[in-house]
Amino acid sequence: MIENEYELSNGRKIYVFREVYDYAHQLSLLKWSMTRPFNFSPSNEGMLVGQKTDTILSCQTGLSEDQFKEMMRIDQLDPVKKLLSNKKLNRNWINANVSKAPTFFHSDAFVEGSLSLLYYLNCEWNLSWDGYTVWANDNLSSIEHIEYPEPGKLVVFDSLIPHKPTSDSPISPSFRFTMNSVWS
C-alpha cells in the first residue's frame, strides 16, 4: 500500500493510499455497490424539476460500523485504522456520477476532527474519462488538491475541507462509483 500525505494551506490534511486491495476484492466491492438501490440525490431536486437527465445517483449502504470495517478491511490497513481510531462511523453511502452531473463544493461534516473516507470503486478508469475529485481552500477561491479516480485508491481527509467530484467525460463507459463515509 502506497501512502502520500498532503497538507493544505489551512493545515488540514489529505491522506492518499494506492494499491489498497487486490483486484478480486476491488471487483467484489464494485459488484456489491452496483446492486444497491440507488436514488436521485436529494441535493439534485432542483435539477429534477428542470428535467435534467444527467444527475448524481446516491444510496445509503445500510452498513453498521463493524460491517463497513469488515467489508473495507480497515483492520488490515494499519495507517487507515490508525487515522480512524477513536472515531465512530456517522454515515456511509455510495455515489454514482455520470457525465454532465451537477457538482458543487461541499463539506461532508461540520464537526471539528471528523474524517471522510473516499474509495474509488471502479476497477478500470482511463485518464481521459475525467471525474477527478477536487479540494478547495476554505473560501473557495483556489484549488488546493486534485485526485484522479484511480482504481483501488482510498483517500482519507478532514471532513471540513470543501471538495467536489468533477463531471465524468461523455466518453466514459460507466458511472464513476465511490464508497464514502464520515467518521467523528
Q: What is the role of each PLM region?
A:
Residues 84-184:
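Catalytic core of non-heme Fe(II) oxygenases with the double-stranded beta-helix
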Residues 1-85:
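Non-heme Fe(II)/2-oxoglutarate
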